[in-house]
Amino acid sequence: MNKITTTISTNNNLEYLKLAVKSVRQNCYYKDMPLIVHAENCDDGTDEWLNDNTDKYSIEYYIDHNDKPKGIGGGMNFCVDKVKTEFVNIIHSDMWCAPNQDLELLRLYDDTDKRLIASSFRIQPRIFPNDPDYRPGTVFHTMEEFGAFCYEFDSDYFDEWATEFSKQNDIKVRKAGGAGFFCRTEDYKWIGGNDPLFAPASWEDKDLFIRMQLEGYEFEMITKSILWHFSARGSHFRDEAKDDLTKKSMRQQKSEHDNIQKWIKKWGVLPEEDEETFVKPIYGTNVNTRLEWIGE
């Protein structure tokens, strides 16, 4: 009986999606687990590719064309609503799962019933000017090391590196990964998932993690589980800014502008980060920490 379902939400990110799907079937310990893909408003061939490859990769996919995009957070909600297993492994379409990424997160739940959000350490290309060598939970490499774009990514080399890195390191950080983490399915639903207020992108992850902290959830990000994250290919570097690391998409610019105003209206103050660069809870507000679960 399956314990885990992996979910992926995507929008016009086909070449990266292909890698994400391949990594689940190639590298996850539970290679045959259910795999759910939500494809929203795609016109880049994603719909056709999913239809043509559903049997090859055993994908349960949903084609969603709408006038009000659910975006990254809403796509996560949509997928989790379809999950029938105890656990859900949420990744984004610009991620690659290293070997046993799922198993190492599942092991954190042995003999515990606490509300735990588990996340993989992330390895990313250094594509933003202020990217350091390391920030808690994320290791940065040069763009040339593994390949910063889908067409040049050296997955074999990365898998070898990630396996050795996990063997040599046993680090836990109190933190969660935006647009991708592992948890009990019911714990995601209990809190209400991502707030559709912030659709299609930006600030929804901070909002979710603050609400979770206020309700007593615990967080662990571990080096024993690894994800490669191309970084921001579904937000900054999309549409007219596709893979152009010198630009930021108009959708992302608008979302950031709009959602900071929505945030202030909802929470009253801007969020702060702790020493692990994890968003701090905001106390003393009238914000509803639990949202009504509406799924789709």
Give each language-model segment a name.
Residues 22-32:
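Short, acidic, metal-binding catalytic loop of nucleotide-sugar glycosyltransferases
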Residues 66-83:
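Glycine-rich, basic loop-to-helix element that forms the pyrophosphate-binding segment
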Residues 88:
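Short aromatic/hydrophobic "clamp" motif used to bind/position activated sugar donors
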Residues 147-151, 158-183:
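A recurrent flexible, glycine/aromatic-enriched loop bordering the glycosyltransferase active site
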